[in-house]
Amino acid sequence: MTVHELDAAGIHDPALRAAYTRCRGLNARHGKTYFLATRLLPVDRRPAVHALYGFARWADDIVDDLDTPATPGERARALLGLEAQLEAGLRGARAAEPVIRALADTAARYTIDHRHFTDFLSSMRSDLTVGGYASYEELGRYMHGSAAVIGLQMLPVLGTVVAREEAAPHAAALGVAFQLTNFLRDVGEDLDRGRLYLPTELLAAHGADRDRFEWSRSTGMPDSRITDVLRAAAAHNRAVYRAALPGIAMLAPVSRPCIRTAFVLYSGILDAIEADGYAVLHRRAVVPRRRRAAVALDGLVRAVAVRTVCRRRADAVDASRSAELSRPRTAGGPAPVRREAV
């Protein structure tokens, strides 16, 4: 976390600054696309975004970190401990864990609904016991907590030009779209963890099943039925992106370049998956560095342009107020009104 970002956000307590810095590190290490897009936000909003994503990454590590040997029971107890700390922190108690401290501070600053955090942890707990989903409807209930609430948490930080309730469905859809893309990109790794986030009904519609996916993963052999499933899942994912897209224009202008950049980069992962023949069971699809750089540069240009316009408008308002205050007033009466020639 840069000193400039923390100062701009009004975060001065040394322990709290260290907590936000910890969240920034988690986001930088685990979420390169999100981290890159976050740099396009105004500096005063970046710490809050890092706190939200840092918490999500930390909880996800408890569930999924294969480098840390732990039984499902140990992971479940760790999540329960995290939830207890979270509840205490949101009530105003000083949390021992820095990530919780930063998250609680962000939730208070932006009046974020606490249910979004408890819903998220509920979905994280289900990952310890649930390895698959029968339908998109069933998967959707899981994704409300694992993805949709992330978009809803972000709305107060990003700001909107419409009522927040109007923008909320699109923000939730974007969170879901991003996670559906993750599911497709990481389908092989998730299988290794004993999970498959492609509904059973989708597999059956194309003559496939979980056993076939596991066979292909273990042997490295392609299968046309698996390709058909993945192609259909990508089409579904694109439909969710389309549902989310109108929400970008509902955000505060200074936040749009960040979210548009994340939108383009993440939907670009689908393009990479398609270009690689849907071989996600055998290798990870990535957006080429040159493409990432071009998208980031476009986002930076947009961000600078928006901030320049906003700064000029603010300067014009300040100048108008200064002129009003300096205008001579008649004794005991209002300032004279300037009449324009007709």
UniProtKB/Swiss-Prot annotation:
Cross-referenced Pfam families: SQS_PSY (PF00494)
Please give the SUPFAM superfamilies that the UniProt record associates with this protein.
Terpenoid synthases
Q: How is the cofactor bound?
A: ATP is required for the transferase activity but it does not seem to be hydrolyzed during the reaction.
**Keyword Zinc in record:** no
Answer yes or no on keyword Cell membrane. Answer: no
* Pathway info: Carotenoid biosynthesis; phytoene biosynthesis
Q: What is this protein called?
A: Phytoene synthase
Q: Which organism is it from?
A: Streptomyces griseus
